[in-house]
Every structure is written in C-alpha cells, then in structure tokens.
Amino acid sequence: MFCLLHLCFYLANFASSIKRTHAVNGCCGLQMIALWAQSSGNADARVEEILAGEERRLAALLGSQGMRFWVCLAACRAMWGLAARRGRAEDSSSSPVDASKFPWRGGQHRTTMMPCLLRVGVFRPCHVRPTGDPSCDVQPPRLGFSRVPDTQVAFYGSGHWDPTPFSVHSCFFNFQVRKIIFLL
C-alpha cells in the first residue's frame, strides 16, 4: 500500500514537473518571438495581442509557481545579451543592424518567414505575404527540430524547412537541461 501511494505521488509530481517545464520553455520562446517580431518590423497589434495572451496563459499554467515564469524571463534575456555580444547580425538586405536586439550568434537576419504561435504553445512557420500579412495554414504542420551550424534551429513542416533567425536550441534545450533543475 505504501509503495502504491508513493508511486501515485511520484507520477503526480512528474506530471506537474512536465507542465511547468513546458511553461518555462514557452516563456523563452515567447520572448524570442516578440524580440524578433519587433526588431524585424513584423510586430503589429495582432502579434502583440497574441503574445500578451500567451504570456498570461503560461503564467497561469504555472499556478503557485508563477514567479518562476519571470525568473525564466530574466534568465532568457540575460542569455540573449551574452549571445548578442558574441556575434553580429545582418538583415536580408545586408544593411547593418543593432546586434544587441537579436538573441542568436552571427548569421543573417531573414524576414521571409514569420513565426506564428499556436494556442498550445507550438511554433509553426508562416509565409509573409507581399502586403506584410502572415499567411498561416489552418491546420498546424508537423514540426520537428534539427541542429544546424551556429546553434540555429531549423523548423520544418509541410515538406520544407527554413532556419529561424534566432537560436531556439540555446534557450529551449540547453536552458531546460541546465536550468530547469533549480527552477523547479
């Protein structure tokens, strides 16, 4: 009986940890999306509204651990600052930009794809129309992650992939492995 209760407690705690891990990962991604959208000129009222809503949802998901959401935010911002000091960024027209605005090391800043945020917290690629409006699929594509040079991550779905202009790998995976232990 004691072993059964212990197992139930362990499983409940494990499920709670997974939920908090997703929320902490989500806050990293949200802030990178916001930073990229603002810096690339793709930010508008709709994007800001989605991001604000997702921040509230993720903070609520953490419940009594809500403070750790903001700890994650601060850690991610500090991480971006360190990465920006190590590299330079260029936009698609090769004109110089302020590297401190971008959270990835080196590479080029491309605005041919605009990330969209699903309600479940998964990112999907959206092509940007000539008018500047994002063209998103109604059904989310099957996504995966692939390591590419310079710590960038490739989003791929619907039969194609493109490197994102920021390093999700550094924030999502390294942050999760090294930082999640003391955050939780």
UniProtKB/Swiss-Prot annotation:
Keywords: Secreted, Signal. It is found in: Secreted. One of its GO terms (cellular component) is extracellular region. It comes from the Eukaryota. The keyword Secreted applies. Residues 1-23 form the signal peptide. This is Putative uncharacterized protein CELF2-AS1. It comes from Homo sapiens (Human).
